[in-house]
């Protein structure tokens, strides 16, 4: 039987046993590749039917050896390390309903497969990191003149008002972004359901009762934390407030025990990459979208 004939379509979020196999597969891939094959949203899609993700699976002797997950726009996939170079990755890509395929870590194997299939790289997302002494130096923070700061937990306005202003600031900052832009109240509420989310980790700079910008922190562990999203409202761009906004989050994370901080940034966002490098961040990983 050809590999393509063994592909089955399913929704793993509705099948507990299959979900456990999928999580085990992702763990085994991570152990070999040193990088997660699925992003956070696609991992959530394995357990949350409401996200509407569909899945393609390949099994061998009742063991899950290949998996592709798809939302409306992109596909992510994982192939068990012991079953690579057997046509599974190619078959999953051929069967995927989207043309955009993520290659997290852009491993040598992913690059070789993309080359074989004549796929083109259309997007690159960098993971940058800072740690130890460099982090200590960049975590110094002082409110700019006329500006105050808070978290969502102690905002100077009602929480619902702060959330509405946060949403507006986000959509102004990311009107160009395929995942972070165009958020709705429902989309924000869904994001706040993540098990790691805390109101105290959503930080704001304020000009009176207007949000200058926000810095959303994700704590993977006390030692490893992330600049999850950071953005400036339109009215406050070009005023030198991006640097203190980033430092506010670094100060918060360092105060909560962080020894390493990571972030994701588009590789072609040259000003942002340069600003993070100036703070002491270096590139740790590259994640690529290939088009078939």
From Swiss-Prot:
Cross-referenced InterPro entries: Acyl_CoA_acyltransferase, GNAT_dom, MshD_Acetyltransferase, Mycothiol_AcTrfase
List of residues binding acetyl-CoA 1: 77-79
Known EC number: 2.3.1.189
Domain of life: Bacteria
PROSITE patterns: GNAT
Record-annotated N-acetyltransferase domain positions: 13-168, 159-292
Catalytic reaction equation(s): 1D-myo-inositol 2-(L-cysteinylamino)-2-deoxy-alpha-D-glucopyranoside + acetyl-CoA = mycothiol + CoA + H(+)
Annotated acetyl-CoA 2 binding sites: 230-232, 237-243
Binding residues for 1D-myo-inositol 2-(L-cysteinylamino)-2-deoxy-alpha-D-glucopyranoside: 40, 179, 218, 226, 264
Pfam families xref list: Acetyltransf_1, Acetyltransf_7
Keywords of this entry: Acyltransferase, Repeat, Transferase
Protein's GO biological process: mycothiol biosynthetic process
Family label: Belongs to the acetyltransferase family. MshD subfamily.
Record function comment: Catalyzes the transfer of acetyl from acetyl-CoA to desacetylmycothiol (Cys-GlcN-Ins) to form mycothiol.
The protein's name: Mycothiol acetyltransferase
Species: Corynebacterium glutamicum (strain R)
